[in-house]
From Swiss-Prot:
It catalyses: a sterol + UDP-alpha-D-glucose = a sterol 3-beta-D-glucoside + UDP + H(+); ergosterol + UDP-alpha-D-glucose = ergosteryl 3-beta-D-glucoside + UDP + H(+). Residues 438-530 form the PH domain. It is found in: Cytoplasm; Membrane. UDP-alpha-D-glucose binds at residues 1043-1044, 1046, 1358, 1360, 1373, 1377-1378, 1397-1398. It comes from Cryptococcus neoformans var. neoformans serotype D (strain B-3501A). Residues 65-92, 105-123, 132-148, 760-785, 806-817, 827-840 have a biased composition (Polar residues). Its EC number is 2.4.1.-, 2.4.1.173. Sterol glycosyltransferase responsible for the glycosylation of ergosterol to form ergosterol-glucoside. This is Sterol 3-beta-glucosyltransferase. Keywords: Cytoplasm, Glycosyltransferase, Lipid biosynthesis, Lipid metabolism, Membrane, Repeat, Steroid biosynthesis, Steroid metabolism, Sterol biosynthesis, Sterol metabolism, Transferase. GO terms for molecular function: sterol 3-beta-glucosyltransferase activity. InterPro entries: ATG26_PH_GRAM1, ATG26_PH_GRAM2, EryCIII-like_C, Glycosyltransferase_28, GlycoTrans_28_N, GRAM, PH-like_dom_sf, PH_domain. It is a peripheral membrane protein. Residues 1-18 have a biased composition (Pro residues).
Amino acid sequence: MSPPISPTPPPLQPPFPPTAIARGPDRPDPPPQHQQAAESLVNAAAQHVAPTCPPTSDELPQMEDQATNSSNDSLIPSRQAPNQEETENAITAGTPPDEMEPTKDAQTVRFSSSSPASYSTHEYPTEEINEPRTSSRAPNTASSQMAESSFDFRSSRDIGSIRMGASALVSALNALPWEEDDDSDDGEDDDEFIEPARGSSSTIYERKQRPQTPSTSHGFHPTHTLHFPFRQNAIARRACQPGTTELDYQYATPETSSRRTSAAGSESSSEGEVPLPKGFVSHPNLIVPSGEGEAAAHPDPKLISDRITKEQQIADVEEQAEILRSAEEQEMRLGKEFVPPKSRDSADLNVDAALREGGSEREDVIEEQMQTNEAEKRLTRNEKLAERLMEVFGLEEREEVLEEMKCWLLRSVMLKGYMYLTKRHICFFANMPNENNLLVKSGPLHKKASRSKLNTKFWVVLKNDVLSWYESTSDPYFPKGNISLQYCHSCDAVSGTRFKVRTSERNYTFTADTESSRDEWVKAIQKVMFKTQHEGETIKLIIPLEAIVDVEKSPTLEFTETIEVKCIDAEDQMSVDSYFFASFPDNDYAFSAIQKLVRERPSPPELPRISSVTTIHANQEPLDTSHATIKRHGTDSSAEKLGMASHRPFRKISSVLKPLILKSSDGEPLEEHSQGPHHNDEDASHLPHIEAISNRRRSEEESDNDYFDGYPPRQVGPPPPSMNDDARNWRPSWIRKPASKLFGSSPSGSFVSHPGRLPTDSSTTVTESGPSLRSRTGRTKQASVTEVIEPPIQYEEEVSEDEMSNKPSVVDSNSAETARKRAARLSWTSETSSGSQMVKSKSDFSMLGSESGHSESAETVRKFRTFFALSDKEELIDHFPGYLYRVLPVSGRFFISTNYFCFRSSQLLYKTKESFRLMIIPIRDLYGLKAQKAFRFGHSGLTVVIKGHEEIFIEFRSASRRKACIALLEERMEAVRLSGENTIVDSHKIEARIMEDLDESTPVEPKSPWPVSPSPLFGSTTSTSFLEFKPEPMKITCLTIGSRGDVQPYIALCKGLQAEGHITKIATHGEYKAWVEGHGIAFESVGGDPAELMQMCVDNGMFTVSFLKEGLQKFRGWLDDLLNSSWEACQGSDLLIESPSAMSGIHVAEALRIPYYRAFTMPWTRTRAYPHAFAVPEHGRGGPYNYMTYTMFDQVFWRAISGQVNRWRRNVLGLDATTFDKMEQHKVPFLYNFSPTVVPPPLDWTEWIHVTGYWFLDKADEKQGEKSWTPPQGLVDFIDKAHGEEKKVVYIGFGSIVVSDPEEMTRCVVEAVVNSGVCAILSKGWSDRGSKKGEPKGDSEGADGVKYPPEIFAIDSIDHGWLFPRIDAACHHGGAGTTGASLRAGIPTIIKPFFGDQAFWAERVESLNVGSSIRRLTSHQLASALIKATTDEKQISKARVVGEMIRKENGITRAIEAIYRDLEYAKSIIKSLPSTDDRTPERISSLLHPLTTADLSFNRVRSRSRSRSRSSQGRFSPRRHTVDDDGWSVVSGGSRSRSGSASAVTSPERRPLNIGSALGSHVFKTALLPNTFGKWRNLEEGDDR
């Protein structure tokens, strides 16, 4: 009779109901119930994940008897079974039972525990599930069949390793409720006892606390920590977080008793139903009648079954993947000798882990144990690296990597890569990746014309694989010519400073300024040629330790020691080849490591040698036949003779040069049997016979026709086994490139240019009839050094049909597919090898008028790439005829390709003059397109806006062509932008690292920071231009005078030099001491007051006559103090960097005999491109005027100081007097710290003059140990409020400028701000210095009697680096540092120059159209400039582009590179000390003599009688008869010789100075001197007075 059906299911209760955990007084201390529950759960989980063997027929009866006994016995006979009405919830609340469906070969787990004597301690085996069950209901037939098929549990002896039970354990731990339910109802009957369910292996008892360690009666269970080798599997995750469907299924009320019985043996309860795990059968008396749960909704059984099946499949897949991954990691960690433990089965391990792991903290423990420590990671990585080396270098066996170091291999080209040290080999690996948009080198060179033979100076740029030359650095899109280095044969230095670049069509001759510059260009071009012709290839060097004779340090390079590895030549035992390695992270450590490795190498008998007569047996299966088979091309049935190689999956095409040293299992070298044309079945599995005659001399004796001239290199020794990776299509790779020789003096070790290709012209032969390999001398072959160049892997889809159709046939039909994969690198000699890469043009134009159909298009593409020197990857999309306007319209054709917009003139006149013949603009540089009216009737115009360049105007004959061009260009611009190819390469990255790591996916070592300077692409082994080899740490002194802006760049430079390991010091005015030392830089004080100097410059102008007159009165003593203090400040220096304004540096460096550099913030070197910064006219006057300003200023400046300087040289420095010509200032290396974007380097500057970029000092006002700078209070709110009101914010500040009327200047600025409608941040400092410092500064309300409006926020000082990026425009005085800061922020800049170089920067800003210049400050002009700066979109966008380019520069890095590069040159120009007889002529007066003694210079004559030989007169200067400048004075009216006559040779009156400008006339005419140049005298003539 069925009990009444509950109307609604009760709420869910915890998994353990009170009846399941209650105890009675007669049950004082029962065994733990959870132990048995865990045992059952683990059994259930293990049965579905751990396949086991089924029991034998003999074991089945015994197991049935045990099951019967276990069902009849009772652990506690005195206890009574509970009433049938009492119900109990299932103990599981996690994984549904059907998800834990076991396999047929499952094994149960038993928990053994020490219990009191009153309890039974024997185990109860699991009852066979397929046995008929005793129940109050008749089981459903289908359900019984399902249970019978699903629950066939068997015992097993070996279940596997711990990994096989780990997932089961996780499921059990997550499903088992370890915590005791403290909130259970105590009112329940505590005396009720649940009899053990049938089918379970033990009785469930309650316990208060789960033991943390297993308590077992068996002593063979050791305690261990459980490690989970893989993440929590899917079953455990679903057990922790079951889905809604799973919960509905678990807690659903069963419809029939048969389903409940057959599905899970579940129990019903008024509290709700939870199915028991499989293997648990409820007691017959506890089964609820079938009608109780019919009111509850139950899902469709088919849906449940499908869901369970799907989830089971997902779980199996995930779990299998985790197990395999764990197995692989475990095997790699332990090596091949790893043996799984056999002492314990997985059931015992699962039981121990279940008892030991804490329930509440199990997830944390699992997560913690899953994390591998650093030692394990390192071990795993070493194992992977050893495997990788064995594969890449073709080693015979896996060798432990003892050391891995970055280094350079020094040969005819410098190769950067990695060295790996093993117990048997020294391996070197270098890779040349594909790099685009790489600026390698640029600079001025003279090019010899092909017709006139005249040399013309161009700006030459080596970018990617193209050498181009331009008329100007400011016009980078119109090259005058170019050379594609891909087709160059050679680049060699010739006589003097000339070098030639040779192609198949013609030779090009270039001339550099110096031999060192010539060598750099030659190395750069050679390196790019090598890289281009071997792009994507790898270079490998394998040196067996057996071949090493000695290892020693060699001073090959000046700035670093190289490690020389000497190896015996395998060809000639009397010769030794040397390999030089340099630039290790630690040279001493690398040297000691290599030495130790060589000392501890095995003795020769222990090392396997390559025998000349070697027989290889292939009857052992482990022998990899694919690595020992070489097939001569042209033979038939190559697939058959390759044996297993044809079936071996392709693994790595670039496997290299494995030494032919194959061992048998006992370690002895294997012998190789010949396999002739007729062989039996037993020999069918043997290797084909290999015979390689590697002796060069023998081949010469045997064949007179086989002449070997040393190149291409040939293989020495038997071909390595790895060449069988593709043994059927050997072809010498040097055929495709005429001059791709890697090693200039190639050692006689083996040099294989491509594995898998047999050089047809080498002496290596393959025969099939000889019984054995023959030796050239009969003695054992020594291990030889292997050098390999491997081409990149080419895939089939990368090779076009045209390439295959034009490629010579070098392989048989069986290897055609492999040949297609490599055709791209082998088709160099094909004329149409790149034709298939063309996109069909939309027009029918052919540049040369070809009419050959499809070949016309291919010919067009080929010639397009040739004309513009573009790579084969560049695809021509379309081309249009049109006109390019360069003063006059130039007819030609515009080409649009994948990444470039090009133009080529078609006019004969322009072709002859090579003027505007070519235009090449990267599409990434295009800023916009704008249709416009044409200049001519019937044409359509188009304006092309280029980033950082002037606009280009072009015309088309029809609007349709213009529309098509615009559409295509816009499409390409968008495509380039989306593909990320629009990044601009840093201009300072002039050199590239072409060598990469061994394993691209896993770095060989952590990416430690390399030196700041980029690694060189054109390093010379004899030149310091190889910047990777830095000099030893030096003591560097920076000498400068002037304002704060003159000192700040040197602080930035010194901090960069300190980062390089040098000791730096700044010598400047004493008022900057605290500031300099606050940045951690040593300080030395020099004389002079910058405030007085600045005031004099503002009042009188820079270096005018009035400035000189006032200087005579005030600064004669100042100059003496400056010279003497500079000499003292520079003591102990190894290198001196000076601003030319300090005037003393070149003399101090000569006395100290140290390298000397100059650095300045404005142009100081003669050029026709820009005027002198102190003589900038209001309007441009052309190149002659610009050059004259430098000449004039140099002469006047030297004349002004020469007298005092020469006396100081004699009295303090111990040097003879000098002249302007003998100083040779134009030869001094110069560092200009402004941007090449703002001031492009002129063509007439030499190669030791560098425009490095700005030396920015971020947070200049911060000091070491002080808190960071913070903006003034209210400034941020002011800026945000203005932007919120849509007003522009500008900065106005003129620095510490001394002005005559500060009140008027303040009023002008305020009115301009109000009239322009902007908000201004005003930094009023123009009355804070010099004689004006006593005046009031003003406050935030106003200054100088002018009240500030709300639109002005007044500040005292501000960090420009913080402020400028937050505002819209800046107006300042035009100092070099402030101008650089505003341009760097990318905002329009307004400059009001006051003195010095400020007018120059104002002119540059206006020329670049990134701002305005105000010559005369008025409120109207300033307001107009502010309006234009904040509203002119063209000016704003141009300023933004310039800012982006400046931010990409790194001026400090480039300056340090230039210092390293020119250090050798700077040392070479140090003058030697003269002998006592070589005294220079001297002058007799000084500019700074008092004005009241006009003839004092004559009375101060100090004549010395000197005897000179003719041989000594020309030692220092070719103009030896030029007398010293000490006897001339602008003020005194000159001096005359003691003989009363001027020297006809040296008198300046007879020198044409070409001073015809208004400025020059004004300077010299206002001097009011009877003789502008004064009198010159020759002391040699006056000695005999």
